[in-house]
Amino acid sequence: MSHFTNIETRFQNLFYLEKALNKLDINHKPQKKVTNINSKSYDIDINLMISQPNGYDIEFCWNGQEYELIADTSFWQQKDSIKGFINNIAKQYAGEVIIGESKKIGFQPIKYQQNKDGSNTCYFTTLE
């Protein structure tokens, strides 16, 4: 039996979410409309969809505040657990936001490194 779960995230910017997914080599498709889930009719705007081999796709849907992850947890087929999957995307998303927004205010990243603990460090310089 299918059970779709909505998982709250803090992903609020589609551009940076797509950049994070691309950097993590997570294939996704933009914009789709779904009208039938679990034999119930819904009108849901899906902003990003990640296909899975079993046909139970993962979706990021805008709820008015953030992109929620919607997935059937019974048919999860990613290499990481749901929590690990979201954490990996969140870490990459945060880095993309920091770099992108820093560039907007005149900073340029000059060095990016991954630390032993799995965190990332980015060094910036000002553009003059």
Swiss-Prot record:
Gene Ontology CC terms: chloroplast
Signal peptide annotation: none
Main location: plastid
Subcellular location: Plastid, Chloroplast
Keywords of the record: Chloroplast, Plastid
Similarity-based family: Belongs to the ycf35 family.
Protein name: Uncharacterized protein ycf35
Species whose genome carries this gene: Trieres chinensis
